Swiss-Prot record:
Pathway: Sulfur metabolism; hydrogen sulfide biosynthesis; sulfite from sulfate: step 3/3. It is found in: Cytoplasm. Catalyzes the formation of sulfite from phosphoadenosine 5'-phosphosulfate (PAPS) using thioredoxin as an electron donor. GO terms for biological process: hydrogen sulfide biosynthetic process; sulfate assimilation, phosphoadenylyl sulfate reduction by phosphoadenylyl-sulfate reductase (thioredoxin). Belongs to the PAPS reductase family. CysH subfamily. The keyword Oxidoreductase applies. This is Phosphoadenosine 5'-phosphosulfate reductase. It is an enzyme of class 1 (oxidoreductase). Its EC number is 1.8.4.8. Signal peptide: none annotated. PANTHER family: PHOSPHOADENOSINE PHOSPHOSULFATE REDUCTASE. The gene is cysH. Its main location: cytoplasm.
Length: 244
């Protein structure tokens, strides 16, 4: 199959983009995650990047993609408020998988932001969205631009939240191809992959965390809570990286 023409697809309205991608998405749904990655590397344009928050199940997509593209840049948007265990997990996975880690941060430090704006995460949905824009969306946009990305791999799964329930394997976001090879995996498949490949969950998994982000907007799971309710005080599920 010939390489997809990103410029031509970007020129189409979103509805027409979706229609153009619908047929290939139907085919991709029938492939294994490994086959999807192979297909993407053969048919989608480089340069390629892989984003990771180094969350609970991050080792899956990091291992899956780097098995076929060892030198792919791995983008981390570091807010400065990650758990100590997350930074330790980043170091451990970077060493274990020999990751080409590329860390991007906000142009203002965490302390400077607090001095200027206060604790944005305590200022309702609007404050959380501004915090995410400063610390996640802008650094990611900068990463995609500086790394000249044309195809962006990510480890999102439909099972993680209602907002991800209808996501396709292949889409266009921010002018680049967005590719989600494990979008249809359930928790059991994740567990089996980790076990078979000698990989670990995030250290906080054993302490009852289902999803891990910043220290101030992540809660330990309690009976009766959904995974979505453990992040951003239940006000939001997405941090903005995978929206729009």
């Amino acid at each position: 199959m010939a390489e997809f023409n990103l410029e031509a697809l970007n020129a189409l309205p979103k509805a027409e983009q979706a229609a153009a991608l619908a047929v290939v998405n139907g085919q991709l749904e029938q492939l294994s995650a490994q086959e999807r990655v192979s297909w993407a590397l053969e048919n989608l344009p480089g340069d390629y990047v892989l984003s990771s928050s180094f969350g609970i199940q991050a080792a899956v997509s990091l291992h899956l993609v780097t098995q076929q593209r060892p030198d792919i840049p791995v983008i981390l948007t570091d807010t400065g408020y990650l758990f100590p265990e997350t930074y330790q997990f980043i170091d451990a996975l970077t060493e274990q998988l020999k990751l080409n880690l590329q860390v991007y941060r906000a142009t203002e430090s965490a302390a400077w932001q607090e001095a200027r704006y206060g604790k944005l995460w305590e200022q309702g949905v609007e404050g959380i969205e501004r915090y995410n824009l400063l610390n996640k969306v802008e650094p990611m946009n900068r990463a995609l631009s500086e790394l000249k990305a044309k195809t962006w791999f990510a480890g999102l799964r439909r099972e993680q939240s209602g907002s991800r329930g209808d996501l396709p394997v292949l889409a266009i976001q921010r002018g680049v191809f967005k590719f989600l090879p494990i979008i249809d995996w359930d928790n059991r498949t994740v567990y089996q992959y980790l076990k078979e490949n000698g990989l670990s969950y995030h250290p906080l998994w054993d302490q009852g965390y289902l999803s891990v982000g910043d220290t101030h907007t992540t809660r330990k799971w309690e009976p009766g809570m959904s995974e979505e309710e453990t992040r951003f005080f239940g006000l939001k599920r997405e941090c903005g990286l995978h929206e729009g």
